[in-house]
Amino acid sequence: MGYTIAQKIIKEHLVCGEMVVGNDIGLKIDQTLTQDATGTMAYIEYEAMGIPRVKTEKSVAYIDHNTLQTGFENADDHRFIQSVCKKHGIYFSRPGNGICHQVHLERFGKPGKTLIGSDSHTPTGGGIGMLAIGAGGLDVAVAMGGGAYYITMPKMVRVNLTGKLSPWVSAKDIILAVLRVMSVKGGVGKIVEYGGEGVKTLTVPERATITNMGAELGATTSVFPSDETTREFLKAQGREEDYTELKADDDAVYDEVIEINLSELEPLAACPHSPDNVKPIKELEGQKIDQVCIGSCTNSSYLDLMRVAHILKGKKVADNVSLAIAPGSKQVFNMLALNGALGDMIAAGARILESACGPCIGMGQSPNSKGISLRTFNRNFEGRSGTADGQIYLVSPETAAVSAINGVFTDPRTLGAAAEIEMPEKFLINDNMVIEPASVEEMDSVEILRGPNIKSYPETSPLTESIEASCSLKVGDNITTDHIMPAGAKILPLRSNIPKISEHCFTVCDKEFPERAKTLGKSIIVGGENYGQGSSREHAALAPLFLGVKAVLVKSFARIHKSNLINAGILPLTFKDAADYDKIKLGDMLELPNVKSEIASGPDVTVVNKTTGDTIKADCELSDRTRAIIIAGGLLDYTKENS
């Protein structure tokens, strides 16, 4: 039996465990990336391990989230990250150089390599043939120190692409079509691998758009083959020596196969408030819109923005629409400026933003009250835009641009013939905003710069034999990490300060939660299906940890968040019988008698509702390793004990 692309990379990097679905496996990590909203905590964690210099082939820290410097906090954090990078062997991408995933694809990604990043959209690297996985900051810190990264061996899904996209239909429409089929939880425990003749018709940036939004499927990662198209992209980036051919064996076996005929696809939109709430644009056509935002790590490549510039050239943005455009990298921005495309955008009435995440994370450009905003981004969770009742639709750059001109939802196919936008034979290469680390000889003299906003990792303690705690919060299905730990311009600057940021934990769902949890001292959260979907932010585990949350009892978890809870020493419990969710109310006193002994011996955990007298059976699905992490009180304590 042959291997899939992902299985080949896993086999090459396997350091422990067997490649059997459901088994815990450890992987050697070649590259890491961080962004600044999660990076400060990752580097605080790395420092705590006491390892002088990173042991990866390449580690890069990007500044792309907290670029709105309305106070000292962000600038201080950036100085801290830059000094840590200088001292410990990490490359530093300065603010303005671009969004981490776009820049990493351009300048550092290598086919066949493993990459983990403290950002859930790290699978963007799958567009170039990497096994690229989003992870919590502590997992990234451990990998930088030379430790293995552990995952549950996933199932393999093949998405077989046939045909060719019609004019005005884009890669964004492909991944929206996949989301329509699989849903936001259909990829959990799976790697999505793209193959078929249709793959050859897609450029590397188009492939990266698709793997980027594999995160919205809940997938471990997504990956494309590395082929002649990959070689041409790397050659144009001056990195042809990084090319390696990578494809699935003809006799590779997949657990699931999805067929998509590219010729049959049409322009699509993900409607509020979920990326899998997908409808054809033709069903929305004519509805008035208020705002259009083009950019993000999903759709900010040179190819995307050249297509946008072509649509906007000689036109005017509708009076009722605000159009904002953020190029994904300095490389893209500079090339658009030199070839005149940037001028066409500005002349049409676009507001040009810096090369950063910006509106995608609620960092500026929030729409008006109940405003309808078309965005080329990857998430449209309620409130994520910064406007609580904003109506966010996820669309392609082509749909976004033509709708901005007309002021209403518009199918781009109404424009007629589409211009052929070619990939450049050579990209503009200027890495002067990537700062190299100090040499081994110089690193001891580098001083770490810490601002007053930077606080220590929250205190943890080993698992006790029994837990008795109140239910401090009860929430429903599809709770996102944006619900747990909101982002935006006011809260993101606090990411280095767990005590302060904890004051905002779950306030989207219940404004009283932080104070209630703090008063209780220790508590348990109860939730529904797919709890913790979305961003990889470990702050969604660290803030509850700081507030005394000992366990989270839900119907099911999203992958990264469950891992982050384990890393923080918080028990991730699931109902054996989902109907038992109704047996717990806010304020009920819950007891986990003998939980330490139960965890040590297997998955079964007993939960007694002392308020009602009900006994509830729960599962705590852990490997031998994660069981030891929970008992130790979290990954940091476990790592110290075993180093």
Tell me what each language-model feature is.
Residues M1-S643:
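Fe-S-dependent hydro-lyases/dehydratases of central metabolism
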